[in-house]
Amino acid sequence: MAVTKKIISQYDVKLVTKWAPPEGDDLRPLIAMPNIPKPTHGLAPRTLLGATTWNRMRKYAYAKADDTCEICGAKPENLRHRHGHEVYSIDYEKGTVTFQRVFCVCALCHLGCIHTGRAITLFRQGNPLYPKEFLLEGAEHAFKIINEYNKDHPGADLRVYRTFLDYLKCDDLREDMERLIEKYQVKFYEEDSKKMAKWGDWKLAIGSKEYPTPYENEKAWKEAMEKQGEKDTARLLQKNMEEKFSGGVYDELNAILNEPVENLNKKGIDISNNE
């Protein structure tokens, strides 16, 4: 459910036409990355590139980061609590989502701060893994990181993606979220809908390859989500995408993709399992 204009009007929400990851070593801004535009749902690199390639990429990201969250600096005792997530740049006017790389992120930053759209949906469905306490913990975690980043970088004006405003539409969350927004003086941003590319123009770019939206329109997207959910839809799309763009190697991807497994093992990067 989209954020209502009435809710948006009560807060400082900046309209943007692009989003790009930070260029320096400070990766805290990744906590504010936007949700993937609906037309490109189901086009996850982990699906399109296959399990072997995806596992190699994320294992490399874990090793490079020393199993430490590249956003908040946490190093989970249980390595199953560190995840791999995609970094994208998004051009809303051109309708292009460009895959950049995979980075190491802790479970709280990943599930409670980045995947906010999924979090609010599962909370509404009563999923026991997404209770009220977890959503609020994720929100406050994100707000703290953004405040600290702005203090360290005067004039940065890093903002929270507008999905957190959806929390205000839940009776069980509204009062606590209003308190957190006031406490941290949170500012938001969202896509400028008036300048958005048409639905059929959206695509996901991986290197020189472009994967077009698999949905004819928003109605088709809704039907697909209702029938199987995004994960199942992605699986069904995989064969079709491989047929459209078969052959060749994604040369522009991280050089790690072409490095022999034995070299990775020597560096302590084990890609033999799915941890």
Segment roles from a protein language model:
Residues 1-57, 74-78, 132-275:
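A boundary/linker detector
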Residues 94-156:
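Active-site/pore-lining binding-face segments in mid-to-C-terminal subdomains
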